[in-house]
Amino acid sequence: MIQAYKILGTGSYLPDLVVENSRFSEIVETNDEWISSRTGIKSRHLSAGEATWEMGVKAARNAIDMAGIAPGKIDLIIVSTVTPDYISPNMACIIQAELGASNAFCFDINAACTGFIQAFDIAVRYLATPAVRNVLIVSTESLSKLTDYSDRKVCVLFGDGAGAVVISDGSKVAETETGLESDTNSEENVDEYVYECFIGADGTSGHAIVGEAFMPARHPFIPADAPESKPRYEHNNGSFFTMQGQEVYRFATTMMPYAIEKVLERSGIPMDQVDYIVPHQANDRILQSAAKRLGIPAEKMISHLSDMGNTSSASIPICLDREVRAGRIQRGQTLVLTGFGGGLTYGALLCQY
């Protein structure tokens, strides 16, 4: 367990454009009943022109405002995304510039829908170093960029949005934007913050979720007799996502509960001491299956699928922020955050809000 961290603030952002299930009947053969009964999704938010970085900035500002720290106090920015606006510069550097967080070093990660879990774990490990005091994590996704809207099984699943958290080293004195100081790891709460993480991957199943076409070598010095570059995966859908739905379902319903069990086993904390599980929002049937396998009531598994759909790595921090602002998740509660996604990747982390 790691005691030296604290979630200071959460934030989220969803675009204004809301697309109800009924709209999809205009472009593919489907209807609201077919979509909602199979996914639990009734609507989703889609960008009407906002870039991935723009949504990330808005979520980040909300998290920073809640944290009560100045952007200049942020030491590290980690962005998780599978839909960056540029190969370079990375999204974290763009967000740093927009926030004025000039003292932060920055990088992006891509672990698909598990990205926020991995970013959180990286952040906690950096907080153990003397150079890092405050970390901003931003998960921001424009999945509409990669969605084939002629594929009725895929296009109804995804939404756009961003979520963010500010995490601080709880063993150090946190300085707020107003200049007030507070010891976030005083003697009365030295045991308040617990942490454990379990992350895994199965690269042999990478074909189950593939996005963006393979780009072969194309420089002018390729010899005429050179072998042709071959993609690792067969992908004939341009830059759009392709997904093997049944294979992903089997993976998710097996590995997400497994990751949760492993993280609880490592921490020594039993399931009945966990207040809520905040899972990646992919499909209501997956969440129901995971709850059943874990033997927990459905209400312990947080779900906001109905009005946001699958927002990839942004889904967990969006749900976390919504629950915090609604007052359902409160200080001192024990949470398990868990996800699975392309790679294939999976993971869970135990934390205290």
Provide a role label for each language-model segment.
Residues M1-G49, D151-R250, T254, Y258, ...:
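Condensing-enzyme catalytic core mediating Claisen C-C bond formation in acyl metabolism
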Residues I7-G9, E50-N110, V263-L287:
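Conserved beta-ketoacyl condensing-enzyme motif
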Residues I7-G9, I35, A63, I77, ...:
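Buried hydrophobic positions in well-ordered alpha/beta secondary-structure cores of metabolic enzymes
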Residues S12-Y13, S80-D85, A111-F116, S139-S144, ...:
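Acidic, glycine-rich active-site loops and adjacent beta-strand->loop/helix elements
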Residues W34-R38, K42-E54, V82-V135, A291-C319:
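Conserved catalytic cysteine-centered active-site region
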Residues Y126-A162:
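Flexible, glycine-rich active-site loops centered on histidine and acidic residues
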Residues P227-L305:
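A contiguous, well-structured pocket-lining segment that forms one wall/lid of small-molecule binding clefts
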Residues D321-T338, L350-Y353:
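Catalytic phosphate/nucleotide-handling subdomain of diverse soluble enzymes
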